[in-house]
């Protein structure tokens, strides 16, 4: 018996996490195995437990459950440092990761770069693993190519949160240069739950033409169909080198050309291999250098 256990509580993250865990659930059912969401007291120690966090997996391992599978969404210790937490949290999370990953029956990674990161950091060799990039759309919306605004206007978009590693400030600097040098009118659309924070940053950057809204997943697709270019800029740090940002699937599904940093290694390599259309900005090479190794000419 397989059991999927999550303790995610943040609304936005919970929705995305549920999407991925549902895919794992359906794969197990299609394989002819029994699977259920959630925990029940007295579950046999022989059950295989699937987690989306190492710290949760460790709790159950300490209770005697040895058949564990972990889906690793991000490198938590390094993310903690980027969020400004103390070094002790980094070391605590690293110890948890090391203990859990060494004993897992299977590890699900977001990218091959993430697997390489863990193998190097903890001197591990994963024999049983699976790579499932982060995404929330897996088919092309043909309506996007029938939207005249996509071809007639130069609309740019940024979607998602404003965490430090998402480089929203640097994105605005790049867009400002585009706005100043474009021979034709340009528009920036920002879809985020952090509307007031985004508005302050945009006004600080003195962007002229912009629109800020929050859209749920079901509404976002229609809004993206009119967009031509989408930003996914990242600082050249390990958190980003192992990442496969969800917004890339949104962009590709709606015919949007990604403007992305080449430090998103897995996506960059895939795009090169498939000869896909791209505007790749080399980290550290795109005149105003800041503390996160960006240059914006």
Q: Model-predicted segments: where are they?
A:
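Acidic anion/phosphate-binding donor-loop and adjacent secondary structure
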Residues: 80-81, 130-153, 167
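Donor nucleotide-sugar binding/catalytic pocket of nucleotide-sugar-dependent glycosyltransferases
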Residues: 102-120, 124-143
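Glycosyltransferase donor-sugar binding loop
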Residues: 159, 186-199
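Membrane-proximal helix-turn-helix segments that form the acceptor-binding/catalytic region
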Residues: 76, 87-109
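Nucleotide-sugar-dependent
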Residues: 166, 217-223, 228-253, 259-270
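Nucleotide-activated donor-binding/catalytic signature segment of Leloir-type glycosyltransferases, i.e.
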Residues: 192, 198-229
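Conserved donor-binding/catalytic core segment of Leloir-type glycosyltransferases
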Residues: 147-166, 171-175, 188-189
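Active-site proximal beta-strand in glycosyltransferases
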Residues: 48-50, 63-81
């Amino acid at each position: 018996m397989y059991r999927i256990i999550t303790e995610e509580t943040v609304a936005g993250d919970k929705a995305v996490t549920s999407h991925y865990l549902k895919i794992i659930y359906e794969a197990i059912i299609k394989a002819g195995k029994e699977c259920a969401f959630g925990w029940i007291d007295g579950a046999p120690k022989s059950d295989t437990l699937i987690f989306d966090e190492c710290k949760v997996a460790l709790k159950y391992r300490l209770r005697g459950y040895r058949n564990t599978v972990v889906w690793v969404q991000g490198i938590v210790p390094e993310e903690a440092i980027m969020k400004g937490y103390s070094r002790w949290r980094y070391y605590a999370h690293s110890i948890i990761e090391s203990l859990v990953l060494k004993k897992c029956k299977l590890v699900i990674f977001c990218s091959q770069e993430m697997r390489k990161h863990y193998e190097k950091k903890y001197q591990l060799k994963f024999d049983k693993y699976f790579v499932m990039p982060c995404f929330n759309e897996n088919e092309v919306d043909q309506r996007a190519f029938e939207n005249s605004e996509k071809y007639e206007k130069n609309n740019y978009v940024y979607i998602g949160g404003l965490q430090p590693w998402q480089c929203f400030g640097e994105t605005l600097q790049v867009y400002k240069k585009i706005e100043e040098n474009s021979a034709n009118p340009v528009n920036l659309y920002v879809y985020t739950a952090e509307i007031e924070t985004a508005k302050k940053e945009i006004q600080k950057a003195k962007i002229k033409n912009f629109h800020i809204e929050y859209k749920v997943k079901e509404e976002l697709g229609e809004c993206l169909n009119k967009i031509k270019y989408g930003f996914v800029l990242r600082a050249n740090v390990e958190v980003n080198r192992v990442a496969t940002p969800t917004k890339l699937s949104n962009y590709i599904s709606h015919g949007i050309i990604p403007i992305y940093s080449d430090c998103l290694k897995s996506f960059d390599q895939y795009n090169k291999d498939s000869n896909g259309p791209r505007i790749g900005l080399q980290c550290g090479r795109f005149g105003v250098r800041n503390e996160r190794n960006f240059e914006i000419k």
